[in-house]
Amino acid sequence: MVKISKDTPLAELTFRKYEKPNSLKDRELVRKLCLSLGLLQPGDSRDVVVDVFQVILEAEEPISSLEVEKRVKKNRENKGLEQLGVAGSNIRRQLLRLRSLFLVEKTGSLYRINEGASLKELFSDKIEKYYLDSIMARVREYIDRADKFFKR
């Protein structure tokens, strides 16, 4: 019997290019940032990650997941958005997604923007230099292997 291996990636990145963000602000700016970073799918109505990220960006001090949940619910209510995906378990899942991209860090039970750095620094140092470089190196290994295997 043939064994079928699982095609589970060790790491995955999705980037999207949109129009320049000149006039965007508040939630719409964070939404486009989430779309650009692959945290949100185009047309996805389950967009609580936008609110979670915005709450963390606006927080002046590290905050707990319970406080994130409370602020997300309040923000969605103020904007007339449905209270979909605001359960504590989903808020923690979204925080984990933000942590996996090195945008948010958890210290004890509190969350903040990673190292209190700017998003530009985090993108450059963590995503481009670390995450993207390691993915690109592995893709190059597959390309080299394919070139050797399928000689022309």
Protein language model annotation of sequence segments:
Residues 1-17, 126, 130-134:
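Eukaryotic partner-binding/assembly regions in large regulatory complexes
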Residues 15-64:
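Short alpha-helical segments that sit at the start of domains
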Residues 62-82:
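Short acidic, hydrophobic short linear motifs in intrinsically disordered regions
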Residues 81-100:
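Short amphipathic alpha-helical interaction segments
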Residues 96-110:
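A short, conserved structural fragment
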Residues 110-120:
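Basic, amphipathic "hinge/linker" alpha-helix immediately C-terminal to the N-terminal HTH DNA-binding motif
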Residues 118-148:
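Short, amphipathic alpha-helical interaction segments positioned at domain boundaries
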